[in-house]
Amino acid sequence: ILEYSANLDKTLAAEHMVETVHEAAIASGLFPRAGARTRAVRQDCYRVANGNPENAFVHLVARVGRGRSEEELQRAGDHIFAALTKFLDPLYCKRPLAISMEFVEISTWKQNNLRHYLSKDKP
């Protein structure tokens, strides 16, 4: 879940950010394509640092199932965060911007048939 401050609306290509992070998460090897879900959520109510209205943020919450080792999480986190910061670099160079990321281990209940449909998409 990519949270971002509303003051980035005019300069942040949220759809491209979602695509960048989604593909980086899959490439990290930690998330199977059929299990990956990436979305961006604009935050309208926020305060960053001293409250200057130009201050902005992007915060990535990566929710993962239990059972990954610290090394796996570190490797994947480094890979995903590098992709996110590279994508945001043009904004980072122009304005006050806080970029952060966290992994949250979760227990989930889920059902999907995406693997079935993904197998049909293969050439």
Predicted regions and their residues:
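Short aromatic/hydrophobic contact patches that present stacked aromatics
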Residues: 1, 59-61, 100
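N-terminal, polar/charged subdomain of small-to-medium soluble alpha/beta proteins
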Residues: 1-29, 33-36, 43-44, 66, ...
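Short edge beta-strands and adjacent turn/loop segments
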Residues: 12, 36-63
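Conserved strand-to-helix beginnings and helix N-cap segments that scaffold or border functional pockets
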Residues: 14-15, 73-74, 114
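Short, low-complexity, polybasic intrinsically disordered segments
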Residues: 109-123
